Amino acid sequence: MAAPTRTPRGIWIAAGLRALAAGGPDAVRIEPLAQALGVTRGGFYWHFENRRAFLDELLDTWERRSTDEVLARVEREGGDPRDKVRRAGMLTFSRELLPIDLAVRDWSRRDRSVARRLRRVDNRRMAYLRTLIGALHPEADDVEARSLLAFSLAIGDHFIAAEHDGRSRAEVLELAMRRLLS
């Protein structure tokens, strides 16, 4: 008799991240995820002790993908500091990672442990920006201001609905980044 096939851990994590991105942590429920995957809840408990452990694993995955993997890829692909800043922003706030990032930011307003984790991630991102922008500008105050503006631009862009007098958002963002990195 063959052993039962278990839904791989990565499948549960991918489904959990999609649920988190779509509806925040309240949308990450075991039974609906199992139904969406066409499996029973039992497979979930083979991989995760409980929902809290699963949520922690989702946060671990988000943190690894949005920092470790992004920074490693940016460094591996190389380029000058301006190229690296742009690439880091595009990867960090990609179609895949942005919805998760925004959900984690919202969640962090209600959960201190999530807020601490978000602070750690943002501190790593800011440290990387400081390093890259510091290679372009020697003045510490200028580096700090430009790093904060670049990071704020990348996050805030997704909350601004304004139009740009005949220009596309992409054109205005590129103009803003050129000025920040000049």
List the predicted regions and their residue ranges.
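N-terminal intrinsically disordered/low-complexity leader segments
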Residues: M1-T7
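Helix-turn-helix
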Residues: I11, A15, A19-A53, E57
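Solvent-exposed, amphipathic alpha-helical segments
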Residues: I11, A15-G23, E69-R73, V104, ...
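Hydrophobic alpha-helical connector segments
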Residues: E57, L71-L98, A150
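Short, basic, alpha-helical segments at the C-terminal edge of helix-turn-helix-like DNA-binding modules
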Residues: D60-S66
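Amphipathic alpha-helical packing segments from all-alpha helical-bundle domains
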Residues: T67, L98-L102, R112-H137, A145, ...
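Helix-loop "lid/cap" segments that line or gate small-molecule binding pockets
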Residues: R87-R95, L102-R110, L132-A135, L180
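Hydrophobic/aromatic-rich alpha-helical bundle segments in the mid-to-C-terminal region
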Residues: A115-R119, A135-S182
